[in-house]
């Protein structure tokens, strides 16, 4: 290796490496979304043409529920990805909110993809093992996505550092529009030093949640309020608990992640003009997820 082959040395080399990961990890969520979308329609096509006991598989109540939840989770994955893209492209030295949303895109969206795939597999059963369909290969590839660039525990420990500022120290920012034009993405190639991660501030999550009045979103808001109250009562002891027990950190981090996840989905739904019935049903799934994480 010659000097001509080395692009950076010292602290800059370290910063460039981590900043490259900040961007590349985003593609893990995008890849999972694409894989699951293909598997969803392949599974639906199979089930809609398979007749069992005089009924098509898609007519069974439990299959309807599995397809409904799968569709809602997949729609949420896509909506989050669209909005997270906006924050990544709008990033600057003064606005580094993407450093929360990109890890969520990598970890949360990829794991959601696994959950959707498991539900689809419950529908198509043995068909998922056959080598002449897409699903069998998707199973192999999708399982590895959440493990790329660190385990979920590592990513959650990183995200948890942002919890205090997210809930208790919001900052006003100009509203970020849809960023799907030919804007110059030069900041993504010059992100600067990687220090100061825990000092990043975010816009008030209540702005998004208060912009809609839907039954399941309102229940979800009650859950958020209960979580915030618990955080306030826990105080500084919470940090010590999370550092000493990674399973506890994972459960707390999952709830925090779900709040930010839902926030961007509401923002994205408004931009994409998503039907309120679909948004309400997505939060039906989230209310159940929130309860499960709280029990953990």
Model regions: which residues?
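Flavin-dependent oxidoreductase catalytic core characteristic
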Residues: 1-296
